[in-house]
C-alpha cells in the first residue's frame, strides 16, 4: 500500500515553499540585474 499524504498537507507544503521562494527570487533577480549592469559598464 503506497504511502499517501493528506491533500491538505501537500497543498500547505507547496504554498509554503512558494512563499519562501518568491521574495528570494525577487532579490536574486535584482542582484542579477545590477551585476549585468556593472559588467556592461566595465567593458
From Swiss-Prot:
This protein's record includes keyword DNA-binding: yes
Gene3D superfamilies per record: Histone, subunit A (1.10.20.10)
GO MF annotation list: DNA binding; protein heterodimerization activity; structural constituent of chromatin
Keywords noted in UniProt: Chromosome, DNA-binding, Nucleosome core, Nucleus
Keyword Nucleus: yes
InterPro entries: Histone-fold (IPR009072), Histone_H3/CENP-A (IPR000164)
Domain of life assignment: Eukaryota
Role noted for this protein: Core component of nucleosome. Nucleosomes wrap and compact DNA into chromatin, limiting DNA accessibility to the cellular machineries which require DNA as a template. Histones thereby play a central role in transcription regulation, DNA repair, DNA replication and chromosomal stability. DNA accessibility is regulated via a complex set of post-translational modifications of histones, also called histone code, and nucleosome remodeling.
UniProt similarity note: Belongs to the histone H3 family.
UniProt subunit comment: The nucleosome is a histone octamer containing two molecules each of H2A, H2B, H3 and H4 assembled in one H3-H4 heterotetramer and two H2A-H2B heterodimers. The octamer wraps approximately 147 bp of DNA.
Name of the protein described by the UniProt record: Histone H3
Record organism: Penaeus vannamei
Amino acid at each position: 500500500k503506497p504511502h499517501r499524504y493528506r491533500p491538505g498537507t501537500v497543498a500547505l507544503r507547496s504554498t509554503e515553499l512558494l512563499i519562501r521562494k518568491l521574495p528570494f527570487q525577487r532579490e536574486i533577480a535584482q542582484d542579477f540585474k545590477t551585476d549585468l549592469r556593472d559588467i556592461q559598464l566595465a567593458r
